[in-house]
Amino acid sequence: LKYYDLIEISIKIYVQEGSQKGVLKQVLTLAKERKIQVQFVPKQKIEKVVSGAHQGVAAQVAAYQYAELDDLFAAAEAKDEMPFFIILDELEDPHNLGSIMRTADSVGAHGIIIPKRRSVGLTQTVAKASTGAMEYVPVVRVTNMVRTMEELQKRGLWIFGTDAKGSSDYRTMDVDMPLAIVIGSEGFGMSRLVREKCDFLVHLPMRGKVTSLNASVAASLLLYEVYRKRFPLEK
């Protein structure tokens, strides 16, 4: 059963003010029967929602609802696995989020945690970039990331932060424990408070001239390192 099947799709219908005749009247009747929210708005509002021609009505669909933290723990328990979460600290690029979701699904991570502020949310662009992974990877959106990290630690997780000045090479990570990996923002990395809450700091060795990797590339390397160690090849 896909995670997507467990959530309720949210729909809002915008109707142009003064347009309640003919087919629109039927739309309003059906919306009322199905308890769908209807909002009467100026024509300009509908034109912002619909890029092309319209007939005085538009529907806005939120095809993904955010999960709760308990859902991530439940996903790990259902697989009889140690929790493996991803924390994204103020990631703003929707393509990076979509790409990270693809990798998270590939390695069997149990979910992603993002902040409500200064972070990209679940949008159509993210859905497209994830190429379907958004249907399978639960995402939790939290108000206070530091407090969430504290809660995770109280529930037994060890948190690995990625930092260019990290004290350990990421290849030395011990992943035989419940864990979460923090990926910082594209331009600034992890915030100071988030960094201070991490149990371990690791870095990706760089032998070339550039000093950093794209957030989604760095995430892919770290997530597959966890996968490689948790599911080693049989000799």
What are these regions (language model features)?
Residues 1-77:
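N-terminal positively charged helical leader segments and presequences
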Residues 23, 119-125, 188-197:
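Short, glycine/polar-rich helix-capping loops at beta-to-alpha or helix-loop-helix junctions
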Residues 42, 62, 89, 115-116, ...:
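Short beta->alpha connector loops at strand-helix junctions that form conserved
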Residues 83-131:
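Hydrophobic, well-structured mid-protein blocks that either form specific transmembrane helices
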Residues 92-99, 144, 213-217:
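Amphipathic alpha-helical repeat scaffolds
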Residues 110-168:
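Histidine/lysine/aspartate-rich catalytic loop segments that bind and position anionic ligands
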Residues 128-133, 192-235:
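Structured adenosyl-cofactor binding patch, chiefly the S-adenosyl-L-methionine
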Residues 160-214:
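Active-site/ligand-binding-proximal alpha/beta "capping" segment
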